[in-house]
């Protein structure tokens, strides 16, 4: 099908860059992977998403801004590559999930350690995508990791480690795909690459 798959496992939102002597810098990545086409939108096959009225600007929470800076997602927010909110009721940074210009879901990251680390607000199984101007995708587990790579390639967050049909449909739109799951999901990453 012409889709090229490359695999190298690293945690995208930390300082680890893979095995010793192997790095993927922003400049070398841009030289290697020249965008060929704009990814297409996917069709949301789920019910309409209604954004809760507890979502406010990220700037209303210092903890939210500090979290975004720590995981290297704040620059993507400032550049307009992602649409973020703060959920005042649940104390979460909220990453809005889009299909084109339409908001179809949201994923929230807990800031206080109470409740689940990540919470999916809607019923869509769409992945979170950031940096849609590239023909190269980097598959990661969470939204923050997708934001941390979106200045170089498109970040596609699975919101977990399971590869769903909806994720595959999005990934088919890219010429090259990296899989960069956390170290504890290495076996799943290898399975994805072989799929």
Go through each PLM region and give its residues.
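Short beta->alpha junction loops/turns
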Residues: 12, 142, 160, 182-185
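Non-catalytic accessory segments of DNA primases and related replication-initiation nucleases
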Residues: 1-77, 81, 88-92, 100, ...
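Single, functionally critical "micro-switch" positions that shape active/binding sites
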Residues: 1, 140, 181
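Short, intrinsically disordered, charge-balanced linker/junction segments flanking boundaries
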Residues: 192-195
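A structural-propensity feature for long, helix-poor, extended segments
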Residues: 173-186
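Phosphate-handling DNA/RNA-contact segment within nucleic-acid enzymes
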Residues: 87-176
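Short, surface-exposed linear patches
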Residues: 32, 77-78, 159-162, 179-180
């Amino acid at each position: 099908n012409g889709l090229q798959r490359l695999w190298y496992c690293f945690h995208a939102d930390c300082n680890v860059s893979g095995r010793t002597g192997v790095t993927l810098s922003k400049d070398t990545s841009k030289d290697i992977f020249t965008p060929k086409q704009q990814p297409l939108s996917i069709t949301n096959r789920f019910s309409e998403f209604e954004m809760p009225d507890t979502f406010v600007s990220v700037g209303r929470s210092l903890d939210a801004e500090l979290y975004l800076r720590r995981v290297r997602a704040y620059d993507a927010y400032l550049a307009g590559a992602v649409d973020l909110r703060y959920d005042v009721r649940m104390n979460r940074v909220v990453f809005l999930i889009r299909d084109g210009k339409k908001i179809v879901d949201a994923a929230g990251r807990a800031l206080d350690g109470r409740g689940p680390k990540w919470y999916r607000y809607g019923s869509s199984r769409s992945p979170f995508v950031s940096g849609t101007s590239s023909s190269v995708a980097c598959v990661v587990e969470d939204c923050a990791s997708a934001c941390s790579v979106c200045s170089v390639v498109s970040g596609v967050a699975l919101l977990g480690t399971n590869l769903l049909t909806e994720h595959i449909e999005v990934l088919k739109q890219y010429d090259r795909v990296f899989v960069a799951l956390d170290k504890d999901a290495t076996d799943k990453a290898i399975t994805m690459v072989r799929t």
